[in-house]
From Swiss-Prot:
Protein name, as recorded: Light-independent protochlorophyllide reductase subunit B
GO biological process: light-independent chlorophyll biosynthetic process; photosynthesis, dark reaction
Family: Belongs to the ChlB/BchB/BchZ family.
Record's subcellular location: Plastid, Chloroplast
Gene: chlB
HAMAP family in UniProt: ChlB_BchB (MF_00353)
Membrane spanning residue stretches: none
Organism in which the protein naturally occurs: Angiopteris evecta
Matching InterPro entries: ChlB/BchB/BchZ, LI-POR_suB-like_C, Nase/OxRdtase_comp1, P-CP_red_C, Protochl_reductB, Protochlorophyllide_Rdtase
Amino acid sequence: MKLAYWMYAGPAHIGTLRVASSFKNVHAIMHAPLGDDYFNVMRSMLERERDFTPVTASIVDRHVLARGSQEKVIDNITRKDKEQRPDLIVLTPTCTSSILQEDLQNFVARASISSDSDVILADVNHYRVNELQAADRTLEQIVRYFLNKARRQGVLTRSLTDTPSANIIGIFTLGFHNQHDCRELKRLLQDLGIKVNQVIPEGGSVEHLQDLPKAWFNIVPYREVGLMTAKYLEREFGMPYLSTTPMGIVDTAEFIRQMEKYVNSFLSKEKVNYESYINYQTQFVSQAAWFSRSIDCQNLTGKKVVVFGDATHAASITKILVREMGIHVGCAGTYCKHDAEWFNEQVQGFCDEALITEDHTEVADTIARIEPSAIFGTQMERHIGKRLEIPCGVISSPVHIQNFPLGYRPFLGYEGTNQIADSVYNSFTLGMEDHLLDIFGGHDTKEVITKSLSTETDLTWNPESQRELNKIPGFVRGKIKRNTEKFARQEGITTITVDVMYAAKEALST
């Protein structure tokens, strides 16, 4: 446990609650002190949904500490069972309430006796795993529980659907553009004549989990959540799964070819061939292939960027920038330390260096050192970019409300390639616009203000040097200011004059 100004992945119980609240008619009870119960507020604010968040906090207060939690937890479970009539109640502690070392499994067993709903305790080590790992584990636990239940009742069958079908595993609440990605995946599968058997956990019913084995194969669009479930289904039922993320033209084509291979492995007579579909989509539907050859995109060739996010999005965006747009990735990084080996394999040869860290200050220092033309990252990298006056495109969770758009903005599939191309192009400062505004003023009559880029206050710019700095085009002003301040510190100068500016320029060019 640690005190942090910013966390890329939250505590484990958030992952469990995200999965539980994604299913239909599943209620979660969080055994937690006040302060840990912010999930309801966070989800209600960010997700554009009309329904209430199905999570109840069983508060650990002084009475609980004096008498124990058993009575309160069991009362909350039985009350919610009678009020909500859920198919499943998931009990989860938080890392704080886990300190009490209570036998919550016993509470669940006691509550199950008088409840009509199924009741389970989230099987997660709250000290060892983060939000994403806990979500992956909880989803697998729920799927395993209901498939075992169906097997005991004798209603579990492996009879495949008549036509090609797939399960989409890992779409869930508070995910980065997950709802849009799901729609795009469904459209892609429909175009190829593949039926969607089930989508879990988002909008799925635990009562229908027994039908998961009827699909021909599983699709795991994001490595962070769903991989454990897919591996479990492969072990138990021999179901193949695709973990290639269909992001960008190259990987989307590879994803479709893998589906073709899986579908043909089940067909005995008429085999399918999706190559004509790939060619048509690449040439006429996706604008990204055409855009990458346009003069606008060629202006970005060789520009240096930094990419940081979850393993899936950071790796995919890195490959898209290099392979499809000719952009130079100075550093690609992820906060998914548990998936570092896979990430390093994916970005090898596509970037100058890889960064695996959960420390936002390390990311900020790397960005300041590389001085990229643009950043592609999370909400935190956007804050860093604003401070350093470097534009940032948001490509991964964690994000704030502006990245839960009402409009249709997928990142997967062929429509996703258009969205990514737009996001990349619009993230770069196109120089000339700022330059013309600096020269002619535009409609903005304010004096140009140069933001301070450093947190240190040991340097001052006199009025003449400030005016000289304001004459420099905006798209390079920040870099010149940083270089001048760096030179001044090296030389022990505290007041920056015009002469110091020119001396810094001369020192840099020699």
